[in-house]
């Protein structure tokens, strides 16, 4: 206010929308806005009307809200801002970004740098490659993988019209190799990986030279304000001030003292640069998710084993003093885990068990009914040994399946997920 009263003031472009909203709310100061200021506000407020061309291949498959996401990303880049695409999980953030990358490549002039870098958790690296091959097969893309020598060669030979895909961990290791490259676009997936701004991963991501930066996350960005600051420090350094100033003026008042003014100020500042849509708001044509609890009472030998193990645990606890109880918590948790395993299938605890399991039988019945109805199924278990039992039963029932465990390599996992999505079938799990 002091600067405005003196006559003129200049603000960074990323402050324009916030300043405009504040000026509309008060009449104490009469302000004249120059043409550049007005044009910027108009561009950002009418971004859905910009006539950015959606590539023909994606035009046919994008939903309405995904097209809006594409226009939003293009508008941010056009105005030299960064942003957070925070759509709910399952709304196709990857597809929106791939459409944006493909449009950038198609619009580029000969010799113009359109090199892009996608940084993602290791488990999603090959998924990004598969999605590019599926939705934009003409988009040149390379997964930076292999040993140190191979990765350095891939980075060194990256063309100006190429998308490089790497993991957060490998970026940290290969940072020196990237220092000679300039990127037109830098994208971080699962942006919460840089939530702690002092970590080596966060510092590495921010050292890459890039013209336009975009962060993807499926969680509400206001959940943790220090995380939000770190992400914006990557996108537009200085936008949320230094962390010390941000913490003093916004984070502490909002979090510790529930200061609504501080939170409102933050929301007004970030609103133009965050796009979040929820499934319930944009997928109105889809039915609500139905949840149903099904109970399978224990029977015969399985019930006897469960009751015997329960009695054993009860006797063990009854004989312990308070001091012994406090020191045997891990043992007690192990016994409770065994009870859960007996509920799944007693053979997980008792070697050589040949009896039935009511829970296993119900599971197989549900699977068979779903398969007969032409449905796909995702089946989870906390016990890999239970997955082994299910694999035997599925083979016997001639039900095709894939089995993913912690020992499945990233490459194999990506192949399986792709095959499952494409309805390619195999009889044997790896």
Map each language-model feature to its residues.
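ASCE P-loop NTPase motor core, strongest for the SF2 helicase catalytic module
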Residues: 30-258, 265-430
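Charged, low-complexity intrinsically disordered regions
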Residues: 1-42, 112-113, 228
């Amino acid at each position: 206010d002091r600067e405005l009263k003196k006559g003129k003031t200049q603000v960074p472009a990323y402050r324009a929308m916030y300043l405009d909203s504040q000026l509309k709310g008060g009449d104490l100061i009469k302000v004249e806005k120059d043409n550049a200021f007005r044009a910027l506000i108009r561009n950002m407020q009418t971004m859905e009307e910009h006539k950015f061309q959606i590539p023909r291949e994606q035009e046919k498959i994008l939903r309405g809200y995904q097209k809006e996401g594409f226009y939003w990303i293009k508008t941010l880049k056009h105005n030299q801002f960064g942003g957070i695409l925070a759509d709910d999980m399952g709304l196709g953030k990857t597809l929106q970004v791939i459409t944006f990358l493909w449009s950038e490549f198609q619009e580029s002039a000969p010799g113009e740098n359109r090199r892009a870098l996608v940084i993602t958790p290791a488990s999603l690296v090959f998924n990004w490659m598969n999605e590019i091959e599926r939705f934009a097969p003409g988009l040149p893309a390379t997964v930076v993988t292999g040993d140190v020598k191979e990765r350095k060669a891939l980075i060194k030979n990256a063309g100006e019209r190429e998308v490089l895909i790497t993991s957060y961990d490998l970026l940290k290791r290969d940072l020196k190799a990237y220092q000679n490259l300039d990127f037109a676009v830098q994208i971080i997936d699962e942006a919460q990986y840089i939530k702690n701004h002092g970590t080596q991963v966060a510092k590495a991501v921010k050292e890459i030279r890039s013209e336009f930066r975009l962060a993807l996350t499926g969680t509400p960005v206001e959940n943790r304000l220090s995380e939000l600051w770190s992400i914006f420090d990557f996108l537009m350094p200085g936008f949320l001030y230094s962390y010390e100033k941000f913490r003093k003026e916004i984070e502490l008042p909002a979090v510790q003292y529930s200061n609504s003014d501080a939170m409102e100020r933050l929301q007004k500042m970030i609103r133009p640069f965050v796009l979040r849509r929820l499934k319930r708001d944009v997928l109105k044509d889809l039915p609500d998710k139905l949840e149903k609890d099904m109970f399978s009472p224990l029977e015969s030998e399985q019930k006897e084993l469960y009751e015997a193990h329960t009695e054993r645990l009860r006797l063990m606890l009854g004989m312990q003093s308070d001091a012994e109880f406090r020191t045997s918590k891990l043992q007690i948790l192990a016994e409770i885990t065994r009870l859960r395993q007996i509920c799944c299938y007693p053979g997980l605890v008792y070697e050589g068990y040949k009896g039935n399991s009511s829970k296993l039988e119900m599971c197989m019945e549900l699977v068979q009914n779903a398969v007969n109805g032409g449905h796909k199924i995702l089946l989870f278990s906390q016990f890999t040994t239970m997955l082994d039992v299910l694999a035997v039963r599925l083979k016997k029932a001639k039900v095709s399946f894939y089995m993913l465990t912690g020992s499945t390599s990233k490459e194999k996992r990506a192949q399986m997920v792709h095959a499952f999505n494409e309805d390619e079938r195999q009889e044997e799990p790896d």
